[in-house]
Amino acid sequence: MLVILSAIVPVGFIILIGVIAGKILTVEVHSLSQITVYILAPALVIDGLYRTTLSASNIGLILLGFALISLVMVIVVEIMAYCLSLDDDTRKSLMAAAVMPNNGNMGLPVASFALGAAGLERAIIYMIGSSILLFGISPAYLLGKSFLSGFRLVFRLPLIWSIFIGISFQTFSFHLPLQLDKSVSYLGQAAIPLALIILGIQLSQQKLAIGKLELLGVCLRLLVAPLLAFAIGNSLGLTGMDLKILILQSAMPTAVNTVILVTEFGGSAALMARTVVVTTLASLLTIPFFLWLLKVYL
C-alpha cells in the first residue's frame, strides 16, 4: 500500500498546489498550456523516443491497443446514446468524456511515479496515440467531417513533428552537440510538474456537480476503459510493463482539453467541464485501486 500511495500522493500534491495557485494568484492558464503544448511536451517526446529501448513491435502493439480500446469505446457510447435517446450535444460530450483520457497532465506523472522510467517511456507512446485522437480525429468527429480532415489537423501538431525528430535521432544514432540533449531532457522533465499544476488551476476554475450523465462518464472512463484495456491487451499478447501501461493509461480521467474541444467543435461545455472535475477527483480513488491490481496480479 505504501508503494501505491507513494505513486499517487505526489501527483495529488502537485495538483493541490495548482488548485491553490488558481485560487490566490492571477494565472494565465492559456499561456502555460501553450508552453506545454509547443515546447515542453514535444521536448519530452523527442527525449523519450531518442532514448527509448522499446522495439518497433512494442511501440506498434501499444498504439494498436490504444486504437482498439478507443474504437470499442466509441461503439459502446454510440449504443448507449441511442438507447438513452440522448440529444446530439450530450452524445458528443459523453463520447469525449469516455474516449479521451488525460494522458498528458495525469497519465505521464502517474506512470513516472508508479512505474519509473520504463513506465514513462511507454506512457509517452500511449500519449502520442491519445494526442492524435484528441487534437486530430476528435475535432473532425465533433464537426461531423471526414477522418481525412482529422488527419490534416494532426499534422499541424508540434507533437507529431517531434515524433519524427525523435525517431530520426534514434534510428540514425544522431547525437546532439554541446550536450544539447541535456537541454532537451530538462525541458521534457519540466512538462510533467507543469502539466499537473495546469490541471490544478483548471480544476480550481470549475464547479463540482454530479448528475446521472457525469456518473455515467465516470463509469465509462474510469472502470470500463481500463477493464477493456486488460482484455484487449491480453488478446494482443501484451505482457509485463507493456500491459501495465496500457491498463494504467486507460484508467486516466477525462482530458481537460475536451472542454475546449466541445466548446469549439460541438457538444455541451457545461456537462464536459463537470465531467472533467468528477472523473479527475474520482480517479484519485480508482487509480490506486488499479495500481494495486497491477501490483498483485501482473
Predicted regions: what is each one?
Residues M1-L298:
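Alpha-helical transmembrane segments of multi-pass small-molecule/ion transporters
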